[in-house]
Amino acid sequence: MMNENLDATGENFSPEEFDVERALRPLSFDDFAGQEQVLENLQIFVQAANLRGEALDHTLFHGPPGLGKTTLAHILANELNVGIKITSGPVLDKPGDLAGLLTNLDERDILFIDEIHRLSPIVEEYLYSAMEDYRIDIMIETGPNARTVQINLNPFTLIGATTRSGLLTAPMRARFGISSRLQYYSTELLSGIVERSSDILKVPITQDAAIEIAGRSRGTPRIANALLRRVRDFAQIKGNGKIDIEIAKFGLKALNVDAHGLDEMDNKILATIIDKFKGGPVGITTLATAVSESAETIEEVYEPFLIQQGFIYRTPRGREVTEHAYRHLGRVKGSNQGGLFDN
C-alpha cells in the first residue's frame, strides 16, 4: 500500500489536505523556489505576451509528480492576470466535455489539463483545431439532419501537464510552443520550502530539522510539505509544538521514511528484486504482481526516484538493482539471504 505521505501525485490526499496544500502553494514567480531556468524563461514569455496583449503560447510541463506543474499553471494565470479553468485528461470523455470548457474561456484565459497524456484519441484530435486555429466544429442534431457548425473561440492558452511525456502523440507535442521539464529539487532548496511552509502553518522549526525533512522528501516539494504536516502532528502530541531535530527524526521513523527518503514500498521493491529475482532483470508486470502494486504506480511514483538515486536501472530485459541497493538493504550480492519482506 502506498505511503500517503510520500504520494507525490496527491491522489490520496483528503479534502483537508488539499486545502492545506493550496494554502502552501506559491502564487507568483517571486514565491516559487527552484527550477531556475524554467522560471527565467517563463518570466520572459509572460512579459512578452503581456506587452503584445496576446495569449501565451500553449505550454507543456512534464516531469515527475509533485514538482510544481499545477502550481506553475496557477502562477502563470496570476502573472498574466487571466482566468484559469482546470480539468484532467481522464475526465474529458467526449468532445462535448471539452467544447463546454473552451467556449467559456475569455480572451487570453488558461485551460489547464492535468494528465494530458490520458486524453482519449477523439478528444485529442478535437483539440487540435482549437489549439491551432481557435475554432471547433460542433455537430448539431443527429441522423439525416446532422450538420456541423463551426464556432470561433477566444484566443486562449492550453497548459498541459504530464508525468509521462513519452506517451504524448507527436501531433500533440508539436502544438506546444513552450515545453519545460521540471527536475527534482536539491535538499538545500527543499529545506527553504519547508521553512517557508512552517511559517505559513505557524509551526516553529529549527534549521537542522528542516534539512532533515528535506533530505527525506525524494527531491519533491509536495512530499516535503506532506512530511512537514505529519511531523507537526508528532511535535504537537509527543513534543512541545516545536519541530526540532529529535522530533523530526522520531516522526520520520514512525512514518517509515528512511534516511534516503525511501518508504516501505520502495524498500519492498528493492528487496523483491533481490530476493525473488536474484537482483533482476525482472519485467514491470511481474514486479508489480510480486509487490501487489500497479505497474503504472511503480513507473510513475517509485521508479523515477529509485533510478535517479542509483538503486535500480532499466535494461531491455527488465529492471535490475545496483550495488547501491544491496548495500542499502545490507545484502550480499549472490547470496540467498532472506529479507525483511519474506513470508
Swiss-Prot record:
<dbReference type="Pfam" id="PF17864">
    <property type="entry name" value="AAA_lid_4"/>
</dbReference>
<comment type="function">
    <text>The RuvA-RuvB-RuvC complex processes Holliday junction (HJ) DNA during genetic recombination and DNA repair, while the RuvA-RuvB complex plays an important role in the rescue of blocked DNA replication forks via replication fork reversal (RFR). RuvA specifically binds to HJ cruciform DNA, conferring on it an open structure. The RuvB hexamer acts as an ATP-dependent pump, pulling dsDNA into and through the RuvAB complex. RuvB forms 2 homohexamers on either side of HJ DNA bound by 1 or 2 RuvA tetramers; 4 subunits per hexamer contact DNA at a time.</text>
</comment>
<dbReference type="GO" id="GO:0005737">
    <property type="term" value="C:cytoplasm"/>
</dbReference>
<feature type="binding site">
    <location>
        <position position="185"/>
    </location>
    <ligand>
        <name>ATP</name>
    </ligand>
</feature>
<feature type="binding site">
    <location>
        <begin position="132"/>
        <end position="134"/>
    </location>
    <ligand>
        <name>ATP</name>
    </ligand>
</feature>
<dbReference type="GO" id="GO:0016887">
    <property type="term" value="F:ATP hydrolysis activity"/>
</dbReference>
<feature type="binding site">
    <location>
        <position position="70"/>
    </location>
    <ligand>
        <name>Mg(2+)</name>
    </ligand>
</feature>
<feature type="binding site">
    <location>
        <position position="66"/>
    </location>
    <ligand>
        <name>ATP</name>
    </ligand>
</feature>
<keyword id="KW-0233">DNA recombination</keyword>
<dbReference type="Pfam" id="PF05491">
    <property type="entry name" value="RuvB_C"/>
</dbReference>
<feature type="region of interest" description="Head domain (RuvB-H)">
    <location>
        <begin position="259"/>
        <end position="343"/>
    </location>
</feature>
<dbReference type="InterPro" id="IPR036390">
    <property type="entry name" value="WH_DNA-bd_sf"/>
</dbReference>
<dbReference type="GO" id="GO:0006310">
    <property type="term" value="P:DNA recombination"/>
</dbReference>
<feature type="binding site">
    <location>
        <position position="319"/>
    </location>
    <ligand>
        <name>DNA</name>
    </ligand>
</feature>
<feature type="binding site">
    <location>
        <position position="24"/>
    </location>
    <ligand>
        <name>ATP</name>
    </ligand>
</feature>
<dbReference type="InterPro" id="IPR008824">
    <property type="entry name" value="RuvB-like_N"/>
</dbReference>
<keyword id="KW-0547">Nucleotide-binding</keyword>
<keyword id="KW-0234">DNA repair</keyword>
<keyword id="KW-0238">DNA-binding</keyword>
<feature type="binding site">
    <location>
        <position position="175"/>
    </location>
    <ligand>
        <name>ATP</name>
    </ligand>
</feature>
<dbReference type="GO" id="GO:0048476">
    <property type="term" value="C:Holliday junction resolvase complex"/>
</dbReference>
<keyword id="KW-0067">ATP-binding</keyword>
<dbReference type="InterPro" id="IPR027417">
    <property type="entry name" value="P-loop_NTPase"/>
</dbReference>
<dbReference type="GO" id="GO:0006281">
    <property type="term" value="P:DNA repair"/>
</dbReference>
<feature type="binding site">
    <location>
        <position position="70"/>
    </location>
    <ligand>
        <name>ATP</name>
    </ligand>
</feature>
<keyword id="KW-0963">Cytoplasm</keyword>
<keyword id="KW-0378">Hydrolase</keyword>
<feature type="binding site">
    <location>
        <position position="71"/>
    </location>
    <ligand>
        <name>ATP</name>
    </ligand>
</feature>
<keyword id="KW-0227">DNA damage</keyword>
<dbReference type="InterPro" id="IPR041445">
    <property type="entry name" value="AAA_lid_4"/>
</dbReference>
<feature type="binding site">
    <location>
        <position position="25"/>
    </location>
    <ligand>
        <name>ATP</name>
    </ligand>
</feature>
<dbReference type="InterPro" id="IPR036388">
    <property type="entry name" value="WH-like_DNA-bd_sf"/>
</dbReference>
<dbReference type="InterPro" id="IPR003593">
    <property type="entry name" value="AAA+_ATPase"/>
</dbReference>
<dbReference type="GO" id="GO:0000400">
    <property type="term" value="F:four-way junction DNA binding"/>
</dbReference>
<comment type="subunit">
    <text>Homohexamer. Forms an RuvA(8)-RuvB(12)-Holliday junction (HJ) complex. HJ DNA is sandwiched between 2 RuvA tetramers; dsDNA enters through RuvA and exits via RuvB. An RuvB hexamer assembles on each DNA strand where it exits the tetramer. Each RuvB hexamer is contacted by two RuvA subunits (via domain III) on 2 adjacent RuvB subunits; this complex drives branch migration. In the full resolvosome a probable DNA-RuvA(4)-RuvB(12)-RuvC(2) complex forms which resolves the HJ.</text>
</comment>
<feature type="binding site">
    <location>
        <position position="69"/>
    </location>
    <ligand>
        <name>ATP</name>
    </ligand>
</feature>
<dbReference type="GO" id="GO:0009378">
    <property type="term" value="F:four-way junction helicase activity"/>
</dbReference>
<dbReference type="GO" id="GO:0005524">
    <property type="term" value="F:ATP binding"/>
</dbReference>
<dbReference type="InterPro" id="IPR004605">
    <property type="entry name" value="DNA_helicase_Holl-junc_RuvB"/>
</dbReference>
<feature type="region of interest" description="Small ATPAse domain (RuvB-S)">
    <location>
        <begin position="186"/>
        <end position="256"/>
    </location>
</feature>
<comment type="similarity">
    <text>Belongs to the RuvB family.</text>
</comment>
<dbReference type="Pfam" id="PF05496">
    <property type="entry name" value="RuvB_N"/>
</dbReference>
